[in-house]
Amino acid sequence: SSAAEDSGFIRAVRYGELEGRCIAYARSLGNLPANYLGAEEFSAYTEKLAAKLGATCRILDGMELKRQGFGGILAVNQGSAREAKLAVLTRECVPEQPFTALVGKGVLFDSGGYHLKSAEAMEGMKFDMCGAANVLEAFEILVREETKENIMAVLPLAENAIGPKACRMG
């Protein structure tokens, strides 16, 4: 085989390793217990990953979410004792060009709020954050593969819980 073929093969193996590692990590995030992985912990990991990748990460919380009009995230989260966050990661490589944005749902636990789910249905509700985990790891793959586009990952992180301030139906 030629050196060019070997080089292509090696690139493919390296890409497969990167993709496999990122998929496994997204799966690991999804498998964490909901009482361990809240918006605070998820956003802290997001900041560390962005720093490793040389990407920009901005975390909006509490008053900043309210000030900027993110009422949907706040409404879903208002029954929770934990604070909602919005993590926005960016990697700009072509100044003045638009961004391709990936958005991943990050409801870290979804009890259904006042529209309470059955115990059986609630078992898998920690997986409502897998959209955010998958987008975060897709962002990592794109950055590490040095895509030539401006990319952004938007991760709304909330918990839909029952509480005296929880959003009511109707």
Q: What is the role of each PLM region?
A:
Residues 109-117, 162-165:
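Short acidic/His/Gly/Ser-rich catalytic and metal-binding motifs that mark active-site loops
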Residues 46, 100-102, 115-159:
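Alpha-helical metal-binding/catalytic segments enriched in His/Glu/Asp
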Residues 155-157, 162-170:
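A structural-propensity feature for long, helix-poor, extended segments
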Residues 1-108, 141-145, 149:
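N-terminal hydrophobic/helix-forming segments and targeting peptides
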Residues 76-80, 117-126, 168-170:
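A glycine- and small-aliphatic-rich helix-loop capping segment at beta-alpha/alpha-beta transitions
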